[in-house]
Amino acid sequence: MFDVEKIRADFPLLSTEVYGRPLVYLDSGATAQKPRCVIDTVDYLHRELNANIHRGVHRLAEEATERYEAARDRIRAFIGAAHREEVVF
């Protein structure tokens, strides 16, 4: 069984109170709340590795491309896709 409180704890915004009650976010059609690990990773990428993928020949672009393709490979394996090219962000 899922521990709802543990899952909620991964999403910083969900610790917010609205009118003295815990926030319940039901507008996922417009955007989705991000867990702390996503927020931290995006923050790191913007601070340390902000470059275009598949376009540059400098170190930052090459590392960004490697990380992008590694993410596609992980998602490909998770969803059972045959090829990384089937994973599109």
Which residue ranges define each predicted feature?
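Pyridoxal 5′-phosphate
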Residues: 1-89
